[in-house]
Amino acid sequence: KSIIYSTETAFGGKQLTEEIQQHYNLSWSDAGRAKRKGGLSDDYGQVMLEPFKHSLIKHIDKAMKIFYSSSESIVISKLVLSGGVSKLDGLADDIASALSIPAEVGDVLKHLTVNNAIDANSFADEGPAMMLALGLALSESR
């Protein structure tokens, strides 16, 4: 199996951070930290996160429709999510359910050996966010 189509959307963690920043009147760094570590009000999931997930699913659905309109015989068998926002709890399951296609969080770092000087857990947490950078680095080395 190989990757036959890849697309990048300009909708993701940055937009969620901006929405958190505006809604809760936080600085950019505080909003980003709250997004990653929690600590927002109890209504965060319903007021911020669920609408964000719904919008993200709409973006993915649109990208899939564009792909299918240009390819008659190829079927998408799985979505691999990347970027920091892909680690949101339940996002892959929500996408799979809404779009009726398997979805998973990609993690290119899980196959790498980590130097002992690096905190392996912190490194592993960044896997989905590093997919594009590592892919570009590997393509340059060929």
What are these regions (language model features)?
Residues 1-142:
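Hydrophobic/aromatic-enriched cytosolic interaction surfaces used to assemble or bind macromolecules
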